[in-house]
């Protein structure tokens, strides 16, 4: 792919992202939208300025006219706690599957994904009886958090 086509491809992709942001803001100006893009959550335009002011995120240019800021997905738990402390209304857009989640829905989905990874990581052939009972107890505790807390994990 030559450089011009590459530039046009990214220009289209970024304008689509920004247009999605503008459409969401028309429906709900008060909510801050985070786009999950790869291993980062990014915020655009005015939302980026709000988050940058509160959490000292670095503002960078998405395009010549649109700014962004963000944080790594690995820091999600840290920032989710801070967002709640500041009573921010947050929604998350997963670009890979074009889904919009409330903040709590996203947290619950992530908890379930982590739970499934925990289950999948167990080598049942190497478990002793004691380890198996401990695994079942750990699993029971993790599942009970979903049942008790719903989305507020």
Predicted regions located by residue number:
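Basic, polar low-complexity surface loops/patches
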Residues: 2-121, 126-138, 142-153
């Amino acid at each position: 792919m030559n450089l011009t086509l590459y530039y046009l491809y990214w220009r289209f992709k970024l304008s689509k992202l920004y247009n999605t942001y503008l459409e969401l803001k028309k429906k709900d100006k008060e909510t801050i939208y985070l786009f999950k893009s790869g291993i980062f959550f990014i915020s655009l335009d005015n939302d980026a300025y709000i988050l940058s002011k509160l959490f000292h995120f670095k503002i960078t240019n998405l395009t010549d006219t649109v700014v962004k800021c963000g944080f790594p997905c690995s820091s999600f738990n840290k920032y989710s706690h801070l967002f709640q402390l500041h009573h921010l209304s947050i929604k998350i857009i997963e670009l890979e599957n074009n889904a919009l989640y409330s903040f709590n829905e996203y947290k619950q989905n992530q908890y379930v994904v982590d739970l499934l990874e925990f289950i999948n990581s167990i080598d049942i052939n190497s478990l002793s009886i004691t380890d198996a009972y401990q695994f079942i107890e750990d699993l029971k505790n993790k599942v009970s958090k979903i049942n008790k807390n719903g989305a507020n994990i």
